[in-house]
Structures are given as C-alpha cells and as structure tokens.
C-alpha cells in the first residue's frame, strides 16, 4: 500500500502485547497512516528486534518506530534499518551501545511496579496486586484483562546486549 504519510510500527514493553496500542492505532489509521504493532515474544532482545524488523516488512517505507518501556530498547536496535525514518520513545528505555536495559534502568529510581513481581520458571510475572501500578489509568475491567493477557518476559531479558544505536543517526 503506497502512502504519503509515514507508516508507524509500535513495539510494546513488559507485561503487554501489541494490543496495548489499540486506541492509538485506530486514531492513526483514521488519519491515513499504515500501522502495525509488533508482537514481541519477550524471550530474547534479538528475537524482539527481529519481530519489529518483520513488522517493518509489512508496511510502506518510510516508517516511524514507536517504543514504550522496554520497547524503546527494541526500537533502538531495530531502528538502524534503512526503512526507518525516525524513532519515538514513550516513557521508554533508550540504551547506548555500551548499556543494557538493566544498566540504563539502574540509573533511575525503581518504580513501584517492581515491588509486585515474582520470578518463577525463568520468567518475570506481574502479580495481581501490581496491576494498579502498571495500568492504573485503565478501568478495573481493562486492568483485569491486561493482567490476564500479560506478556511475561524472560528473567534475563534486561541483561541482553543489543546491536546498533539508531537514535545516534535517526531523528528521535
């Protein structure tokens, strides 16, 4: 589909999936943008970068990558792709080439949500009592849905290194 407006590819963070952008997607589509939300597995950073790169292949170029939370790390690496015109970070990590998500996050105060997690079976689970810290602006029904469908990251995900730092060469 040829388009005069840039395409938009979203990358979600922990305990979420691509549907977390559903309200934005509808609005952007109504404005004439091609929009895709990548579905990150949250197993490996390399795999999540590959998911965003695959999503880039489904839309016209140029594209804008939008990352939320850990999704910022993903777009920082995926954004080196020639089809990417720019990056948007929404309350997101944007590590430099010598950083990991964890080392960048360690520079800032810990958010309340991390008092409501449990590491089990090599995954980081959000406990039910943590949903208000994570999605407090949603209705109770929406919070329950987010908790029930949470994407559960690998416990080592934030320690994995990325290749490429797109914000050094692309508008951000």
Model-predicted segments: where are they?
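Active-site signature of alpha/beta-hydrolase-fold catalytic machinery across serine-
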Residues: 23, 77-78
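Conserved serine/cysteine hydrolase catalytic core
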Residues: 48-49, 140-141, 148-172
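Pocket-forming structural segment of enzyme catalytic cores
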Residues: 120-149
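Glycine-rich His-Gly loop
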Residues: 11-13, 69, 92
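Active-site catalytic motif of lipid deacylating hydrolases and related acyltransferases
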Residues: 4-61, 111
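Gly/Ala-rich beta-loop-alpha elbow adjacent to hydrolase catalytic centers
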Residues: 66-71, 75
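Flexible "cap/lid" loop of the alpha/beta hydrolase fold
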Residues: 80-131, 154-163
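Short, conserved loop/helix-junction motifs that constitute active-site signature segments
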Residues: 3, 78-83, 164-170
